Amino acid sequence: GKSLAYYYPSAITSDDEAIVPLPAKQVAPQNQGVAYLYYEGKFKHTDHFKTNGTKKDEGIMKNFSILDAPAKDHFGYEFKAYLRIPQTGVYNFYLYSDDGSLLYIDGKQVIDNNGSHSAARKGGKIALEEGFHEIHLLYFEDYMGEKLKLKISSRWMEEQEIPDAMLYLPLKK
């Protein structure tokens, strides 16, 4: 039979390493941070931002955070940034949220933690080439107990919240 290598604690296998990585974007962003749009409204799904919500603010922050949300309940964020990947390989992403959240990298959905729910953690993995990749995170808070954490790990990177130094502002179109 075929042998399979399993790398602890990343849970990445030799089969995962055979996945063709998404190519890096040919961009050179200069400024670090995350761009956001902030919405208020009654949401049960991230698709409801445009239909049930009102855009109240936009700006930039150092990392993905909901701590400065003006409302306690019934709000949402749409975050966009470039993620600087230090080495080609398979990366695990972990999204812990209350309520719903979705994570896309280079337009590909990596984690679906959507819907109105108490704090829940979901993960996904994706192979990425060294360089910059578009990261798009959608989050909403329905009511009671808002939480949002996005973590990353790989064979050579312990699980951690994505460091500020890996995040760059999207380029103006």
Where are these regions (language model features)?
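Gly/His-enriched, cation/cofactor- and phosphate-binding structural elements
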Residues: 1
